[in-house]
Amino acid sequence: MSHLNIATLDASQHPYLPASSQTLFAAKAKKKLSFEEISQEIGRNEVATAAIFYGQAKASPEDITNLSKALDIPYELLEEQLSGFPDRGRSVEMPPREPLIYRLFEIVQNYGYAYKAVLNEKFGDGIMSAISFSTKVEKETDADGNNWAVITLRGKWLPFSRY
């Protein structure tokens, strides 16, 4: 399906991304596929799929096979580029300058301690895992026709150990 709103990559704006990012985004743009469509082809959540494209999530052998088929990329090339371990957290400068990413950063700046306090009251002393974790993005439209972004973060609660 052809879309007007397809996320693409300007590699000059992202010098820390792995080579696989350029390979994947070029094929995605050529086929005019959304992350939602690709995620359906490979059997992953659309945010997890996008994280593979940005080098922030590890692709399984099954992911590599399915991405190769969905995007018409030679399997051997993807296997070479995606078989290592991600170098997570290096792709975004801090503080972020990209407006949408900055808004997410700003949410944590403004509400981080409030989240922490409420989570500690509900669960005790600990942290929410970003490893045993899932996330999703949904679109809601209210009665007035306004669009709302709904981002769900689901992380396993990890209590701090006493030692």
From Swiss-Prot:
Coiled-coil ranges (or none): none
Keyword Metal-binding: no
GO molecular function terms noted in the UniProt entry: cyanate hydratase activity; DNA binding
EC number: 4.2.1.104
Listed Gene3D superfamilies: Cyanate lyase, C-terminal domain, lambda repressor-like DNA-binding domains
UniProt superkingdom: Eukaryota
Record's catalysed reaction(s): cyanate + hydrogencarbonate + 3 H(+) = NH4(+) + 2 CO2
Gene Ontology biological process terms in this record: cyanate metabolic process
CDD domains hit by this protein: Cyanase_C
Record-linked InterPro entries: Cyanase (IPR008076), Cyanate_lyase_C (IPR003712), Cyanate_lyase_C_sf (IPR036581), Lambda_DNA-bd_dom_sf (IPR010982)
Position of the signal peptide: none
Known function: Catalyzes the reaction of cyanate with bicarbonate to produce ammonia and carbon dioxide.
Homology family: Belongs to the cyanase family.
PANTHER family, sorted: CYANATE HYDRATASE
Alphabetized HAMAP family for the sequence: Cyanate_hydrat (MF_00535)
UniProt-listed NCBIfam families: cynS
Protein name according to UniProt: Cyanate hydratase
Gene: cyn1
